[in-house]
C-alpha cells in the first residue's frame, strides 16, 4: 500500500525581503541613469567654463553611454560564442548596468584627473549653465541643488593645490587709468548731464575706508635710532599713539611704507626667509614677510594680531587665485582684516612701484573676501562662512568699488554667458562717474555705451566667440583719471 507524501507547506511570503529587493533594484536602475547624467554634467560644465559648445559636449557625453556599453556587450557576446558554453550569473540588464557604471566612472575620472582644479572651477562656477537667464522658483531650487552637489568637489581643488611654501601673488596691480576726452566727439562717460556727484554720508572716525592722507605721524617721526628692530618700532609707535585704532593704522603704515615687494623672488619662485627680522633688515619681501612684520611690530605695540594664510585673486581668470598671507587685528573685542602687501603699491613689467593706500586696512569682511579666501573659515569673519564655490562665483571687485557706494546688479556672477552684447547694471546712489570697457581675450579694448544716474547701465558689444573681460572704472570727477574698480568675464555664445 502506497503512502502519500506529506503535503508541501506553502512558502511563507517575506514582505520585508521583497521590499528590500525592490529598493535595491530601484537603486541599481537609478545608478544607470544618474551616472551618465553626472558625466554629461561634468563634461558640459567644463565646456561652459572654457567657452566651448555645451550642446556638443552634452551630446557627446550622452551618446557615449548607450553606445559604448552596448558595443562592449556585443563584443563580449562574440567572444562568448567562440568558447564553450558556461552558465551566466548576471542577466543582460545587470551586465548593461555594470558596463554603464564602469564607462561612467572611467569617463568622469578622466575628466577630473586631467585638470582637477579646472574641473572644480567649472562645476562650482558654471555648473548651472543650463539655467542661464532663468530665475523662477524652480530654476533657483535647481541651481541651489547643483551647487550643493558641486561643493562636494572641493577635494579636487585641495588635491591640485601646491604644498607650502606656496608662491605669493603680486601686490594689487597697477590698474589702467583712462581719461575721457572733454570734447563732444567720441564716447563719453554718460549721456545727458545728470545731477552732480553726491557727497558720501558723514563717516565714523573709525569707519572704512580710512583716508589715504599719508603715513601716520608717528611713522614719520621715527629716526634711525628708534628703528633698530621690529620690537623697538612697536614700542615707539605705542608710546606716540594711545588710541588702539590709530595705533593699528600706524603699524599698517609702517609696514606698507618701509617694505618693497620682492618681484625678483616672486617671478623666479626662489624665496629668501620671510620672517619678520629678515624682512625688517632687507626691507624686501613677498606677502609672507609683510604679514610677519606686521604681526611682530603689532604685538610689540601691544595689539592682538594674527597672521592669516589663504588665497587671493585679481581677475576671474585667476580662479581661486594664488597663495597669499595677510593679517587680522583685534580692536574693541572685534577682529578686523588688513593686507599691507596690497596697500604698499603695485607691480608692472618694470617692477614694483610704491603707492601707499588704505583700501585694505580694517576692510569689511564682505568687501575683503571679494578677492581673498582664507584657509580657515573662521578668518572670513562672517556669520555664515562662504564656500569655495561661492567665492568663485563672486565677481572680483576692488575695495574702491564699494568705497564709491556701488553695487553690481547684473550680471551678478564672475562668469556668465551672453549673445552679441552684454548689459551691465550697477546701482550708483552717489551718481559717481563711471566708464565700462570690454576686451576679448587677446583683442583690443572697446568702450561700452554708458548711461549715468542712480543706476548706471552699460551696453557692451561682444566680438567673436571668445571670453571677454568687462572692466569697470569710476571717478568723482567727469574729466581726469578713472580708476579700475572691478571686472567680470562674459562668454559670447
Where are the predicted features?
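Secretory-pathway-linked proteins and extracytosolic
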Residues: 111, 119, 138-220
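Short, surface-exposed, charged/polar-biased interaction segments
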Residues: 269-276, 319, 348, 382
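Secondary-structure boundary elements
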Residues: 185-286, 295
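Short linear motifs at secondary-structure transitions and domain/linker junctions
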Residues: 263-265, 299-305, 356, 398-401, ...
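Mixed-charge, low-complexity segments
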Residues: 2-162, 168, 236-237, 348, ...
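Hydrophobic/aromatic-rich core segments of domains that either
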Residues: 289-368
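Residue-level preference for alpha-helix termini and adjacent loops
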Residues: 236, 258-260, 279, 337, ...
Amino acid at each position: 500500500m502506497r503512502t502519500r507524501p506529506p503535503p508541501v507547506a506553502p512558502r511563507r511570503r517575506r514582505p520585508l525581503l521583497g521590499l528590500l529587493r525592490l529598493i535595491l533594484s530601484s537603486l541599481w536602475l537609478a545608478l544607470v541613469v544618474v551616472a551618465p547624467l553626472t558625466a554629461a554634467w561634468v563634461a558640459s560644465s567644463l565646456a561652459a567654463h572654457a567657452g566651448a559648445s555645451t550642446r556638443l559636449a552634452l551630446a557627446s557625453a550622452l551618446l557615449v553611454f548607450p553606445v559604448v556599453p552596448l558595443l562592449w556587450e556585443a563584443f563580449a557576446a562574440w567572444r562568448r560564442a567562440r568558447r564553450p558554453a558556461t552558465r551566466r550569473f548576471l542577466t543582460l540588464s545587470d551586465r548593461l548596468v555594470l558596463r554603464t557604471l564602469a564607462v561612467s566612472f572611467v569617463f568622469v575620472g578622466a575628466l577630473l584627473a586631467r585638470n582637477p582644479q579646472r574641473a572644480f572651477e567649472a562645476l562650482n562656477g558654471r555648473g548651472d549653465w543650463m539655467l542661464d537667464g532663468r530665475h523662477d522658483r524652480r530654476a533657483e531650487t535647481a541651481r541651489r541643488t547643483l551647487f550643493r552637489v558641486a561643493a562636494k568637489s572641493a577635494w579636487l581643488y585641495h588635491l591640485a593645490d601646491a604644498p607650502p611654501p606656496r608662491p605669493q601673488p603680486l601686490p594689487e596691480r597697477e590698474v589702467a587709468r583712462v581719461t575721457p576726452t572733454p570734447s563732444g566727439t567720441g564716447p563719453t562717460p554718460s549721456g545727458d548731464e545728470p545731477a552732480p556727484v553726491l557727497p558720501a554720508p558723514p563717516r565714523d572716525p573709525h569707519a572704512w575706508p580710512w583716508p589715504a592722507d599719508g603715513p601716520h605721524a608717528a611713522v614719520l617721526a621715527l629716526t634711525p635710532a628708534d628703528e633698530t628692530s621690529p620690537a623697538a618700532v612697536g614700542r615707539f609707535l605705542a608710546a606716540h599713539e594711545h588710541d588702539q585704532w590709530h595705533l593699528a593704522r600706524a603699524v599698517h603704515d609702517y609696514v606698507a611704507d618701509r617694505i618693497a615687494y620682492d618681484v625678483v623672488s616672486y617671478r623666479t619662485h626662489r624665496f629668501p626667509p620671510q620672517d619678520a627680522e629678515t624682512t625688517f633688515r632687507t626691507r624686501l619681501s613677498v606677502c609672507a614677510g609683510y604679514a610677519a612684520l606686521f604681526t611682530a611690530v603689532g604685538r610689540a605695540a601691544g595689539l592682538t594680531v594674527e597672521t592669516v594664510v589663504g588665497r587671493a585673486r585679481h581677475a576671474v581668470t585667476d580662479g581661486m587665485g594664488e597663495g597669499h598671507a595677510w593679517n587680522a587685528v583685534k580692536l574693541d573685542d572685534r577682529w578686523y582684516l588688513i593686507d599691507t602687501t596690497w596697500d604698499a603699491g603695485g607691480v608692472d613689467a618694470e617692477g614694483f612701484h610704491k603707492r601707499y593706500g588704505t583700501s585694505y586696512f580694517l576692510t569689511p569682511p564682505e568687501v575683503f573676501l571679494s578677492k581673498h579666501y582664507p584657509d580657515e573659515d573662521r578668518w572670513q569673519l562672517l556669520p555664515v562662512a562662504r564656500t569655495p564655490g561661492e567665492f568663485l562665483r563672486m565677481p572680483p571687485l576692488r575695495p574702491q568699488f564699494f568705497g564709491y557706494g556701488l553695487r553690481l546688479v547684473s550680471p551678478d556672477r564672475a562668469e556668465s554667458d551672453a549673445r552679441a552684447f552684454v548689459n551691465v547694471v550697477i546701482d550708483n546712489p552717489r551718481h559717481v562717474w563711471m566708464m565700462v570697457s570690454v576686451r576679448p581675450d587677446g583683442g583690443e579694448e572697446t568702450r561700452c555705451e554708458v548711461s549715468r544716474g542712480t543706476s548706471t547701465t552699460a551696453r557692451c558689444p561682444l566680438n567673436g566667440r571668445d571670453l571677454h573681460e568687462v572692466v569697470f572704472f569710476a571717478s568723482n570727477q567727469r574729466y581726469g583719471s578713472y580708476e579700475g574698480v572691478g571686472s567680470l568675464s562674459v562668454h559670447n555664445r
